[in-house]
């Protein structure tokens, strides 16, 4: 089995009304082809809007998903994202990982 690499970074942003924290877990993930993985994104605001991005080495950010409401679920290929605004949590599921999914993944809220 080939080993894949997904780097997961967390973003911390400031707002005028206070500090907004966005944290992803795990921060680093070494994937194996064919396995399933989940990336968690916790945030401190009451925002109903969450974004997932992907960045390949040497390239600009690519928008994957925009989740606009509690319970929202979106899927594209082997990636599926969901949003639970009550828990202030979003997840990005990677199903049957393949080499093309090796990238850096980001979540963000506004």
From Swiss-Prot:
Residues 19-110 form the Ig-like domain. GO terms for biological process: adaptive immune response; response to bacterium. Pfam families: V-set. Transmembrane segments: none annotated. Glycans are attached at residues 36, 42. Residues 1-18 form the signal peptide. InterPro entries: Ig-like_dom, Ig-like_dom_sf, Ig-like_fold, Ig_V-set, TCR_alpha_variable. The keyword Membrane applies. One of its GO terms (cellular component) is T cell receptor complex. It comes from the Eukaryota. Keywords: Adaptive immunity, Cell membrane, Disulfide bond, Glycoprotein, Immunity, Immunoglobulin domain, Membrane, Receptor, Signal, T cell receptor. Its main location: membrane. It is found in: Cell membrane. Disulfide bonds join 41-107. The keyword Glycosyltransferase does not apply. Alpha-beta TR is a heterodimer composed of an alpha and beta chain; disulfide-linked. The alpha-beta TR is associated with the transmembrane signaling CD3 coreceptor proteins to form the TR-CD3 (TcR or TCR). The assembly of alpha-beta TR heterodimers with CD3 occurs in the endoplasmic reticulum where a single alpha-beta TR heterodimer associates with one CD3D-CD3E heterodimer, one CD3G-CD3E heterodimer and one CD247 homodimer forming a stable octameric structure. CD3D-CD3E and CD3G-CD3E heterodimers preferentially associate with TR alpha and TR beta chains, respectively. V region of the variable domain of T cell receptor (TR) alpha chain that participates in the antigen recognition. Alpha-beta T cell receptors are antigen specific receptors which are essential to the immune response and are present on the cell surface of T lymphocytes. Recognize peptide-major histocompatibility (MH) (pMH) complexes that are displayed by antigen presenting cells (APC), a prerequisite for efficient T cell adaptive immunity against pathogens. This is T cell receptor alpha variable 39. The gene is TRAV39.
């Amino acid at each position: 089995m080939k080993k894949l690499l997904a780097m997961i970074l967390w973003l911390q942003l400031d707002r005028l009304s206070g500090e907004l924290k966005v944290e992803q877990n795990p921060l680093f993930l070494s994937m194996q082809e064919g396995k399933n993985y989940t990336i968690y994104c916790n945030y401190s605001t009451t925002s109903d809007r969450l974004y997932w991005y992907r960045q390949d080495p040497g390239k600009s950010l690519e928008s994957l998903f925009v989740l606009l409401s509690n319970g929202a679920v979106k899927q594209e290929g082997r990636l599926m994202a969901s949003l639970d605004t009550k828990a202030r949590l979003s997840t990005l599921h990677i199903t049957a990982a393949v080499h093309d999914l090796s990238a850096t993944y980001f979540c963000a809220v506004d």
